[in-house]
């Protein structure tokens, strides 16, 4: 089994709680219950409002994780952080890990940070309530009928900010610093097109002449195209944006 994975090099990720992780499957010292499989390790998981994206990406603990992977052998650190993928692969399933022969170079970072809240205009049942303000309001109404709905949908695990549109962070300046290494930016919510603050990041990348080299992706229900988002795709690298 290969221990190498490109995600510690190529992805900059934070979850719905505003917590940094090496990837969405990583087992970390998450401050809240209810994260992936409820599993935890002692790998640091700082919050977005406490540590900047570049500080996390270039932190000593992320460097150590990359160093262990370059070594080619399973270490206690890899066993802890990558436990979910390792277990999947032991059971014959394909994990999220992306084995490569060499560490990636150049533009490799995929920015996948939940920075702009969880405001959403729909209440789709496949979405977790922490990712949709409409689902949260729906759950609150159901709880008036029967409190067990809150327990079933893990309402008690929500942060107060999540109940009022989610957490909103301004990391534009730090994203600009990382821009020369960014390959892709994935805007996620909630519903991105009712979150106008994400355009501040896009405008900043255009101003420093980096947008043309970055692929732009959206996780969207495509029901609220009130901003002319296609204007931003003209600054794409070979028109590769996925909207």
For the regions a language model picked out, list residue spans one by one.
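Accessory C-terminal segments flanking Radical SAM cores
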Residues: 1-99, 109
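C-type cytochrome heme c attachment motif
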Residues: 83-84, 122-129
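Short functional micro-motifs and their immediate structural scaffolds
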Residues: 90, 125, 132
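Leucine-rich repeat
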Residues: 173-178, 204-209
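Single conserved hydrophobic/aromatic residue that forms the stacking wall/gate
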Residues: 232-243
């Amino acid at each position: 089994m290969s221990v190498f994975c490109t995600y510690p090099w190529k992805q900059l990720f934070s979850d719905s709680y505003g917590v940094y992780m090496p990837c969405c499957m990583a087992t970390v010292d998450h401050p809240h219950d209810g994260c992936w499989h409820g599993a935890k390790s002692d790998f640091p998981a700082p919050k977005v409002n406490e540590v900047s994206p570049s500080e996390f990406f270039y932190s000593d603990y992320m460097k150590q994780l990359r160093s262990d992977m370059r070594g080619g052998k399973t270490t206690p650190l890899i066993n802890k952080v990558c436990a979910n993928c390792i277990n999947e692969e032991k059971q014959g399933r394909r994990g999220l890990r992306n084995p490569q022969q060499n560490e990636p170079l150049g533009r490799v970072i995929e920015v996948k940070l939940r920075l702009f809240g969880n405001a959403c205009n729909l209440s789709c049942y496949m979405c977790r309530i922490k990712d949709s303000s409409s689902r949260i309001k729906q759950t609150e109404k159901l709880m008036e009928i029967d409190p067990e709905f809150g327990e079933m949908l893990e309402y008690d695990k929500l942060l107060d900010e999540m109940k009022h549109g989610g957490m909103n962070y301004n990391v534009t300046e730090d994203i600009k610093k990382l821009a020369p290494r960014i390959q892709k930016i994935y805007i996620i919510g909630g519903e991105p097109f009712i979150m106008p603050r994400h355009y501040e990041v896009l405008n900043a990348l255009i101003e420093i002449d980096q947008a043309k080299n970055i692929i732009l992706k959206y996780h969207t229900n495509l029901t609220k195209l009130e901003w002319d988002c296609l204007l931003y795709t003209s600054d794409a690298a070979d028109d590769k944006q996925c909207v």
